[in-house]
């Protein structure tokens, strides 16, 4: 949801409402906006300086007061919560890690596929990523209500945490060291999906245990992020059904 009223944003912060990001107009010296920014940062909310044109576009009606807050459609969980869900089911964890997926339609489609494939959760970064917005919820066809989503400040650190928990990390890359069908996805697995434009970031790539490629037989050399996620998830499903 999108809120552009000063008092509504202040009350949302005071109430502890889960806020994805707060956009504040560049150059504004209003004390209330300054208070919102400092309170939000203290609460761990991402604050973005934006020009008036961007805020006008986001608010549609141009009726913002120099601030727009994007609130989540549901609460985020912790990574430990996701691991515990797998433990309670007696299953090897299957987790999707999104590395800077900024397109909400892609994120929604990934969450939808994760739900259908029985993944235990999805992880996104706080910055340079779409959050659990209404667009993501709509694109997911309601899957955001069922798939636990964790939000972390640092994806490389997250991957190290998962590895310490015995989870193997599989990154997707056109120049992967092995093809998808040689990868063993039956064990505890985290599948990392990079952004559609740039793929995985360098630090994330370096933390992966395996880099796998999807065989491409046509003239186009890449798939969009949600399609790549679907292929890897259902290869994991196929392998696990055959155990």
Region roles according to the model:
Residues 1-85:
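N-terminal positively charged helical leader segments and presequences
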Residues 10, 116, 138-143, 202-243:
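Structured adenosyl-cofactor binding patch, chiefly the S-adenosyl-L-methionine
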Residues 7, 11-18, 29, 34, ...:
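RNA substrate-binding interface of SAM-dependent RNA methyltransferases
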Residues 58-72, 143, 148, 152, ...:
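Short basic, glycine-rich beta-strand/loop surfaces that mediate nucleic-acid
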Residues 170-224:
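Active-site/ligand-binding-proximal alpha/beta "capping" segment
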Residues 51, 72, 99, 125-126, ...:
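Short beta->alpha connector loops at strand-helix junctions that form conserved
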Residues 5, 106, 222-224:
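Active-site helix-initiating loop/hinge in glycosyltransferases
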């Amino acid at each position: 949801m999108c809120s552009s009223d000063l008092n509504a944003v202040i009350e949302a912060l005071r109430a502890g409402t889960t806020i994805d990001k707060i956009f504040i107009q560049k150059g504004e010296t209003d004390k209330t906006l300054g208070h919102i920014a400092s309170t939000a940062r203290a609460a761990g909310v991402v604050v973005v300086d934006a020009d008036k044109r961007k805020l006008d576009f986001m608010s549609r009606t141009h009726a913002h007061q120099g601030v727009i807050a994007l609130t989540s459609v549901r609460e985020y969980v912790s990574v430990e919560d996701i691991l515990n869900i797998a433990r309670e089911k007696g299953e090897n964890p299957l987790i999707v890690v999104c590395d800077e997926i900024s397109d909400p339609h892609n994120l929604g489609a990934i969450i939808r596929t994760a739900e259908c494939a029985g993944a235990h959760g999805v992880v996104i970064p706080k910055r340079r990523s779409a959050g659990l917005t209404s667009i993501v919820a709509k694109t997911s066809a309601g899957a955001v209500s069922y798939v636990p989503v964790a939000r972390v400040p640092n994806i490389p650190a997250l991957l190290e945490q998962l590895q310490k928990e015995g989870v193997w990390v599989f990154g997707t890359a056109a120049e992967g060291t092995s093809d998808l069908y040689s990868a063993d996805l039956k064990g505890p697995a985290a599948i990392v999906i990079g952004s559609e434009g740039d793929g995985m970031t360098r630090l994330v790539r370096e933390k992966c245990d395996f880099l796998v490629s999807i065989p491409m037989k046509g003239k186009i050399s890449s798939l969009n992020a949600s399609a790549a996620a679907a292929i890897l998830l259902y290869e994991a499903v196929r392998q696990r059904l055959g155990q």
